[in-house]
Amino acid sequence: MNDSVKTSLKRTLIGRVVSNKMDKTVTVLVEHRVKHPIYGKYVVRSKKYHAHDEANTYNEGDLVEIQETRPVSKTKAWAVARLVEAARVI
């Protein structure tokens, strides 16, 4: 057989943290562009995901990468993998 290193086949998404009010959970807004079938215009579609944040380290406005994982609760089956860009503080 092949003794190569296993790679993760879990889905990853990049989105912005819109809420961190829950304990060990952040709400991540993921946006993607879809071409309208009739008019041809690109429309922004979005979806919110609850992601596991074990240490409560991520704040609103942070750009994070989330990775699919086993279900942690009724609505949470994603975990924050890494911080892509921290929120700008004004």
UniProtKB/Swiss-Prot annotation:
Highest taxon, organism lineage: Bacteria
Keywords for this protein: Ribonucleoprotein, Ribosomal protein, RNA-binding, rRNA-binding
Pfam families cross-referenced by the UniProt entry: Ribosomal_S17
GO BP: translation
MF annotations from Gene Ontology: rRNA binding; structural constituent of ribosome
GO cellular component: cytosolic small ribosomal subunit
SUPFAM superfamilies the UniProt entry points to: Nucleic acid-binding proteins
Disulfide bonds: none
Keyword Ribosomal protein attached: yes
Task performed by this protein: One of the primary rRNA binding proteins, it binds specifically to the 5'-end of 16S ribosomal RNA.
HAMAP family: Ribosomal_uS17_B
Assembly mode: Part of the 30S ribosomal subunit.
Family: Belongs to the universal ribosomal protein uS17 family.
NCBIfam families (alphabetical): PRK05610.1, uS17_bact
Protein name: Small ribosomal subunit protein uS17
Species per Swiss-Prot/TrEMBL record: Burkholderia multivorans (strain ATCC 17616 / 249)
Protein encoded by which gene: rpsQ
